[in-house]
Amino acid sequence: MLQPKRTKFRKQFKGRIHGVAKGGTDLNFGAYGLKAVEPERVTARQIEAARRAITRYMKRSGRVWIRIFPDLPVTSKPTEVRMGKGKGSVDYWAARVAPGRVMFELDGVPEDVAREALRLGAAKLPIKTRFIQRIAE
């Protein structure tokens, strides 16, 4: 699963996702993409599950790019532990996804295959998404 090799600090503030995505809103690599419509934290497990669903449907033909990276450590305290005594340990890694952010890109497959593969991948994610494609020049 995806996670940073090393970080400057072990734990981060929770933070909020305000407004729309500042960058990463256009297709850079593939001809088709999956774009987020609402703000949410997407975990490394969800990203991996979506990637597996997409590649499995494409039968390993074509190419997949993951445009988001889980660099936010999410902490949690063990169950039945009283409040206080410091922040919990890092439980999992997540990526903050703002509306308009392209999360996955595909290339080398027909449009109907790409559309269905991204639909299956989107089912693994906790947010509403939209299928986008490169405009023919």
Curated annotation (Swiss-Prot):
**Signal peptide location:** none
The entry's family comment says: Belongs to the universal ribosomal protein uL16 family.
Output the superkingdom of the source species. Bacteria
InterPro entries registered for this protein in UniProt: Ribosomal_uL16, Ribosomal_uL16_bact-type, Ribosomal_uL16_CS, Ribosomal_uL16_dom, Ribosomal_uL16_sf
State the Pfam families in the record. Answer: Ribosomal_L16
Q: What does this protein do?
A: Binds 23S rRNA and is also seen to make contacts with the A and possibly P site tRNAs.
> What gene name is given for the protein in this entry?
rplP
In Swiss-Prot or TrEMBL terms, this protein is called Large ribosomal subunit protein uL16
Q: Which organism is it from?
A: Bartonella tribocorum (strain CIP 105476 / IBS 506)
Keyword set includes ATP-binding = no
Quaternary structure and interacting proteins, as annotated: Part of the 50S ribosomal subunit.
Organism lineage: Bacteria, Pseudomonadati, Pseudomonadota, Alphaproteobacteria, Hyphomicrobiales
